Amino acid sequence: MSYDYHQSWSRDGGPRGSGQGSSGGGGGGSRGSGGGGGGRGGRGRHPAHLKGREIGLWYAKKQTQKNKEAERQERAVVHMDERREEQIVQLLNSVQAKTDKDSEAQISWFAPEDHGYGTEVSSEKKINSEKKLDNQEKKLLNQEKKTFRITDKSYIDRDSEYLLQENEPNLSLDQHLLEDLQRKKTDPRYIEMQRFRKKLPSYGMQKELVNLINNHQVTVISGETGCGKTTQVTQFILDNYIERGKGSACRIVCTQPRRISAISVAERVATERAESCGNGNSTGYQIRLQSRLPRKQGSILYCTTGIILQWLQSDSRLSSVSHIVLDEIHERNLQSDVLMTVIKDLLHFRSDLKVILMSATLNAEKFSEYFGNCPMIHIPGFTFPVVEYLLEDIIEKIRYVPDQKEHRSQFKRGFMQGHVNRQEKEEKEAIYKERWPAYIKELRTRYSASTVDVLQMMDDDKVDLNLIAALIRYIVLEEEDGAILVFLPGWDNISTLHDLLMSQVMFKSDKFLIIPLHSLMPTVNQTQVFKKTPPGVRKIVIATNIAETSITIDDVVYVIDGGKIKETHFDTQNNISTMSAEWVSKANAKQRKGRAGRVQPGHCYHLYNGLRASLLDDYQLPEILRTPLEELCLQIKILRLGGIAYFLSRLMDPPSNEAVVLSIKHLMELSALDKQEELTPLGVHLARLPVEPHIGKMILFGALFCCLDPVLTIAASLSFKDPFVIPLGKEKIADARRKELAKETRSDHLTVVNAFEGWEEAKRRGFRYEKDYCWEYFLSSNTLQMLHNMKGQFAEHLLGAGFVSSRSPKDPKANINSDNEKIIKAVICAGLYPKVAKIRLNLGKKRKMVKVHTKSDGLVSIHPKSVNVEQTDFHYNWLIYHLKMRTSSIYLYDCTEVSPYCLLFFGGDISIQKDKDQEIIAVDEWIVFQSPERIAHLVKGLRKELDSLLQEKIESPHPVDWDDTKSRDCAVLSAILDLIKTQEKATPRNLPPRSQDGYYS
């Protein structure tokens, strides 16, 4: 098949011999449907025979048809000028001739001043498709070797450095370690720390703990917060090995659920051992892109759970590790649940491996059962008594009367928070409704009538911030000194409570230090949490659940438990994430209570009634049951853990079959898995990258299209967090600064790129400039530095896989197109598709605004923090977004305006259709553009060549040589990039193409 230009183009507008274009979903529909009808209806009026509701339905139908026609007329026009059209025809004919004849095309099209696309197609041999199919399994195995050629190069995965060190027994080292420990015992610093350690409940159980661990392969240790299990158990094991003359054989790795925990615990243990952390001493830590490694043997390493999962790719048996301690497993995060199952399998091959599971008290038995009823041991906690108060106690104590506007929610949601359909929640809601009258009746025997009346009046489905403010005021005026810790579900509650307190003259004085604690807050503010206040100053910390386990604030005496916690769930039926404030679990409530009473007797105020307390879940739902599974599915395949569904079925709490099937379907649509659920070459690359699959695909395309540096900035931000902070009281200024950084890009992603590049420039000029820049634009320098480190890690992965030739994200060869905003947007589209939304201008009476729709959800909203939230002057009708989440509404997070060519070349399947008088080209049947049919066929042909080229690049990665103008790679990519770059800013709306040969330019 050849592509003919103008003179020999076939009558139907398509390539010669192509036949008539298909006429699918854009079909015209019947003429006059919904028109005036019969009878005396006319001039747009309804037919006379219609009555009542029928009239309303008639007008609604007519308005729908009117809207559809308006939308049809607003379709953007896909166009190209005659010169580009002729060049693309020649390019496609030449490539087609190369395929048909398997010989080199001698046509020369390249002329730099004429936008030509190469001179000839190179004579590289193509892989025979039949041979590829026959050798698919062998090819995938070879592909894995090609994809991760790190050990053959100078690149070493720094996060795996500790694992890859040898761990052979060494008698002379054993003796040295013993002598070193004996010397320590005479060190005044060590002796001083021993006095503290001996006060911990765990210290008195040292022999019992060590004997149990030495005599069993798996041990479960439970213990209250503050008992010393995290800091002491690892030291007991190490010292026991050293004292028995086996120190070199001991290599302990202890997982932590959070980065901050891994660092702070490692530093604490090092201090107790009279050492510095890392630097070849006995204790160190490893988190992503940051480490202080201990000595090779006779050591303790604290690390995040993800580090061990990463190690398993290099050494599936963790050969150099003697003890694995899985800490805080009661939190049930996704990674720790998966690691438990992997370790359970590993025990069959590593009979010498010791596994210690450490959990809160309440559910230790469940972990023991999962590991074949292994032995358990409990370490008692050490806290002062804490008095607990329920909502009715608080109302009675402070004589609280709510605003008259507050009314009970009439059980409109009860336990069914958000939009998550959980049967057990519905059952508890029914029980709550049933028991409520009897509970109120019983309360009247113990509390004043006014208290019970207030309790009935309140909408306890909401967090009553006025009540919390009144309670804080009561504590300050009536109770003894001591810090106050308030638990709230999210940023909006924290911000509002802060404003409520600061609106009162009393709290504006220097007698109070009010500290909001949230991931959006500047880090410098959060460090104040740990500092003791001067005499006469009361600390008030307003925090999310980060303060439950991740950090310890020693001087807290009063805890106010708001009773709610923000949880993300994944709705498999509607394929959408939801975030809502759920009731806390009993385990959460216990942890919160435990934050008081660390230094003296404490008080804990729970903002829910006794009936609610009795029906709380024992624990939060494990993360694996409320999150998308795509990234995990790729990990299962790259670690060779067997079939995805089979492996997941063996977890402690397996996810639903619907969630597993949906994730596998998404990965197949992304071409990461084939029909046999095996990794494709693209899937191998995506599994190796430490990001979710869509972001991984964006990274690969950033390398292929040579706009690496900005794309890595975007990828790092999406997989970690953006660098913006929101100081309380300055939200509007922060929004304005963010829009200033957007620079008319209509893109949250490019706003982050601009912020990052500005920071790099300021940093080059010196520390003062960097500090001023971050202050002016409300940026976190710590987060920006983390993004910088992550970009380096991504670039090293790409180097190891062969996609780039340098480990520097700023390598000039990998950034030829980094200054072109439109190409970067195309790469964003390539990664995030099919997360597409349609923009429709809505000319209201008061002001111009836009409405945004997605294919599956209908009307949605752009998130208020987006630079596009108030934008009305879009160049195109389409947005690509990173995340869609339902809270109070369905919001799109991190969105970018994209052009028609971005969607045509990097979207889904293309079809060419007719819609009444319009010739159209559609992507996945719903993203529709006007286009002369011959132009549509050229675009489709060019897209086919791009798909073929990308497949070859993924199967055999190597950088594009843009200097080799004879190559097919360079010719095809140059043609596509040229069309994207020259796409007009605005496409005329409400106008059909001028003629078959006409163009909008």
From Swiss-Prot:
The UniProt entry annotates the motif Nuclear localization signal at: 510-521
Which keywords does this chain's UniProt record carry?
A: Acetylation, Activator, Antiviral defense, ATP-binding, Cell projection, Chromosome, Coiled coil, Cytoplasm, Developmental protein, Differentiation, DNA-binding, Helicase, Hydrolase, Immunity, Innate immunity, Magnesium, Metal-binding, Mitochondrion, Nucleotide-binding, Nucleus, Phosphoprotein, Repeat, Repressor, RNA-binding, Telomere, Transcription, Transcription regulation, Translation regulation, Transport
Using the UniProt annotation, give all residue ranges assigned to the region (WH domain): 622-691
Q: What happens when the gene is disrupted?
A: Mice die at around embryonic 7 days post-coitum (dpc). Conditional knockout mice in the hematopoeitic system leads to hemolytic anemia, a reduction in blood platelet and erythroblast development. Cardiac progenitor-cell-specific knockout mice die around 12.5 dpc and lead to abnormal cardiovascular development with a reduction in cardiomyocyte proliferation. Mice display increased NKX2-5 mRNA but decreased NKX2-5 protein levels, respectively, in the heart at 12.5 dpc compared to wild-type mice.
* Stored PANTHER family: ATP-DEPENDENT DNA_RNA HELICASE DHX36, ATP-DEPENDENT RNA HELICASE
In this chain, the stretch annotated as RecA-like domain 1 covers 99-379
Region DSM (DHX36-specific motif): start-end pairs: 46-68
In what residue span(s) does the Helicase C-terminal domain sit?
A: 470-640
What GO biological process term is on the record, naming one?
regulation of mRNA stability
Q: Gene name, please? A: Dhx36
Per the UniProt record, the source organism is: Mus musculus (Mouse)
Its name, as the record gives it, is ATP-dependent DNA/RNA helicase DHX36
GO terms (molecular function) for this protein are:
ATP binding; ATP hydrolysis activity; ATP-dependent activity, acting on DNA; catalytic activity, acting on a nucleic acid; DNA helicase activity; double-stranded RNA binding; G-quadruplex DNA binding; G-quadruplex RNA binding
Q: What is its EC number?
A: 3.6.4.13
Give the location of motif DEAH box in residue numbers.
327-330
The protein's superkingdom reads Eukaryota
* Stretches with biased composition (Gly residues): 15-41
Tell me the segments the record calls region RecA-like domain 2: 380-621
